[in-house]
Amino acid sequence: MNGKYILSALMNGIGAFSDDMRDGLRGPFSDDTKGAFLAGIAGEEESIKFGIVGSIAHPQVDMTRVNYDKKPWATHPTQHISYVSCLDDMCLVDRLKASVPSLTDTSKSKDYRTAELIRLDLLAQTAVVTSQGVPFMLAGEEMLRTRRVFTTVSHRPTASMSSTGTT
């Protein structure tokens, strides 16, 4: 049985991150180069809808087509943490550049690529902040933060961190 379902059923007020929504928007955690909805790939809509309603039962969500969770696990949307990236994975900009070919296509102008990146970032964050769940944004995502070659904070050398210890 899904651990999120057990926690939410037994402990009122306990929340969990929604991997269904994250992966439905940007692609699977296990493959940085595979895109999903933000890359224009169809098939992840139910996972995104499940995230937007806050992982609760909803008549317009077909649970058989949701990525991981096959039944609602939240009893209230505030138990659902909506996000597309966090500290233990690529930040959103880096993930988009790795999984959306048009963002690195040098035959397109830099202005076009930047505008497209901004549109995709806005679309992703719109899903997060307008969902019924609790929105979570990695610091700097609103400014198109990048970690460049380091996929997680734990892989980044201390010398490359600011004096506050953040990236």
Predicted regions and their residues:
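Conserved alpha/beta catalytic core and glycan-binding cleft of carbohydrate-active enzymes
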Residues: 1-159, 165
